[in-house]
């Protein structure tokens, strides 16, 4: 029993829920419940962690913190992490090695985020691609994997500037009254 309490205390520290250990589940917010679930996954020291819809029912800010936490756990504990998630843009907030897209029960794609975002697979499968990728495509740009579209902050946008500028000048915006 002492070992169990030690393990709970340790993972509660990792996911920042130590102050909540005395609370009933009904007293916890959605984000706190997600962190409790993550703690449950961490209790057993396994090499591969599977998170099934870790962003479900979380607002975007809390979802971002959840992805930060998963990323931190992955780095600090040297774990392989598998995330099953429909909110792709939120999951891509941190670095991802590979994305597997499943459609109609079969693997449709298994590639790097850069390769996937440069393709039309997400659209074909009814998955919303990141908004900046959609905007570039609306501007007539052919997004290339070599420009690293996984993160807008680090993407090479130089090849797209002229087309985006031309598109912006052609788009008529409604008058603000």
Locations of the language-model features?
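Hydrophobic anchor residue at the start of the ABC signature
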Residues: 38, 84
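Catalytic Walker B motif of ABC-type/P-loop ATPase nucleotide-binding domains
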Residues: 49-52
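Conserved ABC ATPase signature
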Residues: 24-28, 32
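Conserved ABC ATPase "signature" region
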Residues: 3-20
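Helix N-cap at the start of a conserved alpha-helix in ABC-type nucleotide-binding domains
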Residues: 60-62
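Conserved beta-strand-loop-alpha-helix hinge in the C-terminal portion
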Residues: 106-132
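Conserved H-loop
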Residues: 87-94
